[in-house]
Regions:
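Conserved N-terminal catalytic core of the sugar/cofactor nucleotidyltransferase
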Residues: 1-7, 15, 29, 33-121
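A generic "binding-loop/recognition-motif" signal
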Residues: 12, 23, 58
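Conserved catalytic-core motifs of eukaryotic protein kinase domains, centered on the activation segment
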Residues: 18-21
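Active-site mouth loops of central-metabolism enzymes
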Residues: 26
Length: 121
């Protein structure tokens, strides 16, 4: 059974400029969650709970999105807004997320090669 997947999310997103000048294209919202979350949710549903993400400079928002935000959760605890985090909290609890940075943007093949250590056998 395949239990690992790799998301190459290091690109510049130039086709979405100017929106991607300050926000990674993978974090652009589709309805109420970022694009990358849809792919991760599908992978986890398919049994691939070890998710490797190959990121680039300026992509810290992706790593932050798949990590617990204790300050935010504490701030909204007990309020009606707490339910908004339910979906991503479930994803975070079910998955294991590992990031590696692609130092040079040399294309998709290079991004996948950069992520090879995250996937292994």
């Amino acid at each position: 059974m395949i239990g690992k997947c790799l998301f190459p999310v290091a690109g510049y997103g130039t086709r979405f400029l100017p929106a991607t000048k300050s926000m990674p294209k993978e974090m652009l919202p589709i309805v109420n969650k970022p694009l990358v979350q849809y792919g991760v949710e599908e992978a986890i549903e398919a049994g691939m709970t070890n998710c490797g993400l190959v990121t680039g400079r300026g992509k810290r928002a992706i790593a932050d999105h798949f990590d617990i935000s204790y300050e935010l959760e504490h701030q909204i605890a007990g309020s009606s807004k707490e339910a908004y985090l339910g979906g991503i909290r479930e994803v975070i609890e079910r998955g294991v997320f590992t990031m590696v940075r692609q130092r040079e943007m040399l294309g998709l093949g290079h991004a996948i090669l950069t992520g090879e250590p995250l996937i292994g056998d």
